[in-house]
Amino acid sequence: MKTTSLTLTFFALSLCLAFTPAQVSPPSPAGPGTAEAHPTDPTTLYLPIVTRTATPSPPPPAWWQPSPGTSWQWQLSTPIDFSFDVDVYDIEMFDNDASVVAALHAQGRIAICYLSAGSWEDWRPDADQFPAEVLGKDYEGWPGEKWLDIRRIDLLAPIMRARLEQCKAKGFDAVEPDNIDAYTNDTGFPLTYQDQLAYNTWLANEAHARGLSIGLKNDADQAQDLLPYFDWALTEDCYVQDWCEQMGVFITADKPVFAAEYSDEISAAQFQSEACPQMAAWEFDAIFKNRDLDEYRLGCP
């Protein structure tokens, strides 16, 4: 399309008007000792002064999120032995009140709340709240304990939520749900991989909703799938049973693996001379315990 000379002339005039500085009235004379606000030249272009504010720090996480290299003690007996110089104590929920958790906090320690999320225990104060239909086969080797039908989240939810509320009310920082690999055991129910995945994910979300960190207990085959939902892992016998490396995905994600080896499977000397170097190579935080989880603890040299 041809452009006429009239159009070009109008366009040039528009540009001139657009870039002509606005006329500014000169300021009043400054008083004695007072600097002028700005020069009086009306053709001077003044740019605003832009200041930057510091980027605010991100908010702290809503729950404890540890990293590898966190030392720990695991004691499910009472009374608690507070003498170990460690970062974390993993202790029983029902048998310890808020004063024990407060004492750990006073020493600058994190308190983990142990509870069973996959089995029924006949000695617990809430044992009568479990409907008969969710109770499965006896848990072999643990008298008074039965597996739970984890498919029935509708029936288990009120009980498990109440337990998590107890953890929170007592001041715990985290929760260790035990027996959350039921689908790999003879429970009396046809539990599947997906059943366990759904239950464990539900548990993690419930813990986080209460500001509680949560650890994946054993359940190595689901470690990759559950990694986004769990903040750390805890293993038993993974060295002697040769499955520790499955939990390495947690280390890769900068989440610790708390590893326990037991005195009924390996000697203390073997633990320190054989298991510890390998645990260090994996960056696991390993301890040597009696299986009844009393106060005895041996760390790596």
For the regions a protein language model found, what residue spans apply to each?
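Intrinsically disordered, low-complexity Ser/Thr/Pro-rich tracts
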Residues: 1-60
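Glycan-processing catalytic domains of CAZymes
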Residues: 58-301
